[in-house]
């Protein structure tokens, strides 16, 4: 009897809720719900990510490829005029806070394994990602421009069920007139431990360049838990804690995926 074929597709969804002032002095709250369709190959994978998102704030924070970044923008101000008696009027200008929701930027990304790892050699993969501007930039859901990312991922199995991770990359940010957005580098370093054969706990330090000069680079700690319930079904959760003004104060993620 022939052995069952390896899965070639993976479909998953997750929910991330984050909040912080990102160095702007005004709190922004974001809910990000992406659906991911992934085609699996022996030497890598290709994924399509279609997200829904909701942002409450003053438009000072924009998602770039699913990651919140301080972009320095503000929502339109509102001017009101009130009577004060004796023919006098007082005009007040107030900053408008809004809640906007809708389809976010679509992401197409690929991974190609160039080196198969062992106990002495890390697994090495090259990654590429394109952000397609499907989000409504007029409502603060995106920049309205394409972004392109290139990077590498390293994974090293260690003795006693430990695993080390290191990722780094560079994003070409699409030009937005008058916004002064800079291209962005990023990296993260992580250490994981298999609590059981099917449960991996890990912690990461992450940093990426602020896209607007004058803001602090976002830096955070990410604690993640991944459970391979069956060969087909997987669950994940994560907690994020900001270490700099450019990062959210906190973030929490829940997700699941199915392979077939």
Regions found by a protein language model. Name each.
Residues 2-175, 181-260:
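Transmembrane beta-barrel domains of Gram-negative outer membranes and organellar outer membranes
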């Amino acid at each position: 009897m022939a052995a069952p074929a390896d899965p070639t597709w993976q479909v998953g969804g997750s929910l991330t809720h984050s909040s912080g002032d990102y160095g702007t002095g005004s709190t922004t709250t974001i809910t990000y719900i992406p659906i991911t369709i992934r085609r699996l190959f022996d030497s890598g994978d290709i994924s399509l990510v279609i997200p829904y998102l909701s942002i409450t704030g003053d438009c000072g924070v924009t998602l770039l490829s699913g990651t919140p970044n301080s972009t320095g923008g503000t929502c339109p101000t509102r001017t009101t005029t009130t009577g004060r008696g004796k023919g006098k009027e007082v005009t007040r200008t107030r900053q408008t806070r809004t809640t906007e929701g809708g389809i976010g930027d679509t992401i197409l990304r690929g991974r190609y394994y160039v080196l198969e790892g062992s106990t002495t050699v890390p697994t090495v993969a090259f990654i590429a990602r394109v952000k397609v501007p499907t989000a409504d930039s007029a409502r603060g859901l995106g920049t309205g421009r394409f972004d392109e990312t290139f990077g590498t991922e390293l994974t090293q199995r260690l003795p006693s069920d430990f695993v080390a991770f290191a990722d780094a990359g560079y994003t070409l940010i699409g030009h937005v007139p008058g916004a002064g957005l800079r291209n962005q580098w990023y990296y993260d370093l992580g250490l994981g431990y298999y609590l059981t054969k099917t449960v991996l706990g890990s912690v990461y330090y992450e940093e990426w360049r602020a896209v607007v000069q004058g803001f602090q680079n976002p830096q955070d700690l990410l604690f993640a838990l991944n459970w391979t319930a069956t060969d087909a079904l997987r669950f994940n959760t994560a907690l994020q804690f900001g270490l700099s003004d450019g990062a959210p104060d906190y973030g929490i993620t829940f997700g699941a995926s199915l392979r077939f």
